[in-house]
Every structure is written in C-alpha cells, then in structure tokens.
Amino acid sequence: MGNDLLLGFQADRPTSVSEQQFLPYHLMEDFDKAVVGPDGHKLVKETRTVIKPFTHVVEKEFPLSPTACAICLAAFIIILTLVECKLHKTFWLFDLLLLLLIGVCGAILAVMWFSEHPTVRLNLQILLLNPIALICLLPVVRRERKGKSHWFWAVYFICIILFFIGNILQNYAEGMNILALSLLVRSGMSVWKNKQTPVIQQQKA
C-alpha cells in the first residue's frame, strides 16, 4: 500500500516506448534489439545473467489487508465523531493525532512532486493526505480546546470532495476512498458544529 500511495495519476496512463525504458528490463530488451551501422551490426554482442532471479518467501504477513485496515479506521473515526455530537464535545487530542498523521503523509507526497520519477510527481492523493494539516495543526487544536471550530475543516472538506472527483483521473491506493469517506464525515461534522455553536450559545443565554 505504501508504494501505491506514492504513485500519481500519470502511472495510470499508457506509456510510450521511451518512457518504458525507465524500467531496466525494457531498456535491456531495446539494447538487445538495437542495430548500429549500415551492415546490421548489433549494439549488444552478448547478454549474461549476473544474478539469477529467486523467489522471496514471506514467512509472516500482516493479517489485515489495506481495505480491512481502512474500514476499521474509518469505522473508528465515524463512531468517535458521532459520540462527539451526542455529547456536544470535541475530542481535540484525537484531532491532534489525526492531523499530525495526515500532515506527515502529505509532506511526503509533497516532496515527491519534486522527484524526477514521472509517476510520482502529480499525485491527487495529496488532497486527502494534505500537508496543510501540519501548518494548521496548532491553530486547530487551540480553537477546539475553546469549543470552537477552525476554518481548516471547511477547506479540508472541499479538498476531500475534489479527491473523490479525482477518481476519474487516478486509481487511488487500496482503501483510500473508504478512509476519505470517514474524513469527509468528520470534517463536515466540524463545519456543521461551527455553525451550530452560536445557536447553542444563544439558547444557553
């Protein structure tokens, strides 16, 4: 799953012959077929195998698939969000950990935009794993500790909508859409609670 997270939407489009040469095996085949000179002299005289391929046996795999992990995490986020609404509270410590995780992953994706690798530079998954979460982390927590919401959640809600639209252009990593749905619920609920705060304060007054 980690490798899939780094792949952008260009990984899903057909590649040209020159782009396929980025892979050593394809480059080797093209060199083997290459002819130099009018006499038909081949570029490669001989091909030898330095290290023979071998099968790597994984003795113990992680018991859950990426989809199963995404479902468990999404269920936890949604249930926690519903409990918040029921109690009229904000679990700011959970948001602290959540935004930290989102922001760190987003920072990694942002760095990949400067890579020379053609398939990792433009990755729409950065809309979900957003590096802006790191920038807004402390302001969000400060406001939530005072019982208020931050504008970040409204911006993040829009980013997740754009993430879903991005399915047209890119095949996301396994389980990402499930995770995005739970984060859409949480960010949307934060926006809704922000609108409800003045009403609740008036009722208490």
What does each of the following model-derived ranges do?
Residues 33, 42-45, 52, 60, ...:
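Context-gated lysine
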Residues 1-54:
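Soluble extramembrane regions of membrane proteins in the secretory/endomembrane system
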Residues 49-119, 125:
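Core alpha-helical transmembrane segments of integral membrane proteins
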Residues 1, 75, 89, 196-205:
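Polar low-complexity intrinsically disordered regions
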Residues 114-205:
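Generic detector of multi-pass transmembrane helix bundles and their immediately adjacent loops
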